[in-house]
Amino acid sequence: MPELPEVETTVRGLATVLDGQVIRRVAVNRADLRRPFPEDLAQALTGARVTGMGRRAKYGLIHTDRERTMVFHLGMSGRWRIDPEDIGKHDHLVLETGEGRVLSLNDARRFGSVDLVDTGRLEEWPPFAALGPEPLGPGLKARHLAKAFEGRIAAVKLLLLDQQIVAGLGNIYVCEALYRARIHPEREGGKVSARALGLLVPAIRAVLEESIAAGGSTLRDYARPDGELGYFAKDWRVYGREGEPCQCGGVVKRIVQGGRSTFFCPRCQK
């Protein structure tokens, strides 16, 4: 599943051809993805000017001058394509700008979603209302995590994946951040020290910023809107490296937490 860096990279790529442009044509090529497309999607977007782009958690935002925002989620396999050579069966939504640029939302597994939300009420929209702070924003501080983790016996790895605690973190980057902060993923949240939390926050930010700079991490279906792959996977220190040596001389181990693979070094993560 595309995580925060992949969505941020996607939004930035789309902005290069969409921001400030009028959407001349909208083609909705099927009725639904994970849930139905808004019935008025084509009508609401046709002729609208894009006034800005953004991201909240793992959602991309396309703001228009009609005070409506198109909110998209890439699901498991979704990606946007800019000026594709052809429109295939998995290109379920197509936008054409006044300058003739074409953007298609391609989603083979159809776990993504597209919604229309009143721009002024975005934070009240149910999927956003309970979200925690953005990990790259000023709201994520060690004291925020300390309060959220206080008295919790759940593993710190699982708590960091809770979108109500921190918005947008996913499996890959939580594994990598915990490794950099030298925190064992199974440690109870309430037992993570203030010192460790002080290391964790900058580790989260560093991992995300480095991944965004590398264009994200390409696993199976993800690619940037320009068709290029994300290259952060080559910099993974533990994720996907079960049995490989750690820099400390230990060996990377894999366990399962909450149905997801966790990678860590038992020697240097305590």
Curated annotation (Swiss-Prot):
Cystine pairs: none
E.C. number: 3.2.2.23, 4.2.99.18
InterPro entries registered for this protein in UniProt: DNA_glyclase/AP_lyase_DNA-bd, DNA_glyclase_Znf_dom_DNA_BS, Formamido-pyr_DNA_Glyclase, FPG_cat, MutM-like_N-ter, Ribosomal_uS13-like_H2TH, Znf_DNA_glyclase/AP_lyase, Znf_FPG/IleRS
Top-level taxon in the UniProt lineage: Bacteria
One Gene Ontology MF term: damaged DNA binding
Zn finger (FPG-type) start-end: 237-270
The UniProt record lists the keyword Transmembrane helix: no
Keywords: DNA damage, DNA repair, DNA-binding, Glycosidase, Hydrolase, Lyase, Metal-binding, Multifunctional enzyme, Zinc, Zinc-finger
Cofactor note: Binds 1 zinc ion per subunit.
Cofactor: Zn(2+)
Active site: P2 (schiff-base intermediate with dna), E3 (proton donor), K58 (proton donor), R260 (proton donor)
GO biological process, one term: base-excision repair
Role this protein plays: Involved in base excision repair of DNA damaged by oxidation or by mutagenic agents. Acts as a DNA glycosylase that recognizes and removes damaged bases. Has a preference for oxidized purines, such as 7,8-dihydro-8-oxoguanine (8-oxoG). Has AP (apurinic/apyrimidinic) lyase activity and introduces nicks in the DNA strand. Cleaves the DNA backbone by beta-delta elimination to generate a single-strand break at the site of the removed base with both 3'- and 5'-phosphates.
PANTHER family, per database record: FORMAMIDOPYRIMIDINE-DNA GLYCOSYLASE (PTHR22993:SF9)
NCBIfam families the record matches: fpg, PRK01103.1
Similarity-based family: Belongs to the FPG family.
Record text on subunit structure and interactions: Monomer.
Protein name as it appears in the record: Formamidopyrimidine-DNA glycosylase
Organism: Novosphingobium aromaticivorans (strain ATCC 700278 / DSM 12444 / CCUG 56034 / CIP 105152 / NBRC 16084 / F199)
Gene that this polypeptide is encoded by: mutM
